[in-house]
């Protein structure tokens, strides 16, 4: 239980630090969002039909909506990736599998996936018919501000 309290403290601290970063974004930088209260954000995630949508962007954080379906990515998954920054994913709609460092866990609406930097991960939609909609919080910028990609294949390759 002591380990879980430490994890909870880490998550709460990370979320509060990200909120603080959002509130200090600079309006003069057009690549950043202004400080904002986003009402009913999970409903906005459900409305998103794009592969990826940059919802809010700050200097060192970003909120991205994702819609994982065979229409947006024929593989019906994010794809194996590793980041130089932390990532927190909230499952909003649909069911999936989260693979973190080779360990698979089934996920459903209301679940959170915490991914520290450097951890190899993938999120897979387990339904060929229903979308898997997620909200992802990055502790860095993952895609350009105000970007929207209808399909995974639309994302510029690095």
Regions found by a protein language model. Name each.
Residues 2-11:
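Bacterial N-terminal signal peptides that target proteins for export
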Residues 11-21:
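Bacterial N-terminal signal peptides
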Residues 19-64, 149-158:
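A short, N-terminal "cap"/entry segment at the start of jelly-roll beta-barrel domains
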Residues 59, 99-103:
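Short strand-coil-strand connectors
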Residues 65-82:
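Conserved short histidine dyad/triad with adjacent acidic residue
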Residues 85-96:
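Glycine- and acidic-residue-biased ligand/ion/polar-headgroup-sensing regions
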Residues 102-117:
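Short acidic-glycine-tyrosine-enriched beta hairpin
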Residues 118-144:
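Ligand-binding loop in jelly-roll beta-barrel domains
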């Amino acid at each position: 239980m002591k380990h879980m309290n430490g994890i909870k403290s880490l998550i709460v601290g990370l979320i509060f630090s990200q909120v603080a970063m959002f509130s200090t974004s600079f309006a003069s930088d057009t690549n950043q969002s202004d400080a904002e209260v986003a009402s009913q954000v999970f409903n906005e995630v459900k409305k998103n039909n794009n592969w990826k949508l940059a919802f809010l962007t700050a200097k060192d954080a970003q909120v991205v909506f994702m819609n994982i379906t065979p229409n947006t990515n024929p593989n019906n998954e994010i794809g194996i990736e590793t980041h130089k920054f932390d990532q927190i994913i909230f499952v909003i709609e649909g069911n999936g599998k989260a693979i973190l460092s080779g360990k698979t866990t089934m996920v459903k609406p209301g679940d959170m996936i915490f991914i520290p930097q450097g951890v190899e991960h993938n999120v897979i939609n387990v339904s060929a018919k229903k979308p898997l909609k997620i909200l992802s919080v990055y502790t860095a910028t993952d895609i350009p501000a105000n970007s929207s990609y209808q399909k995974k294949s639309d994302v510029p390759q690095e």
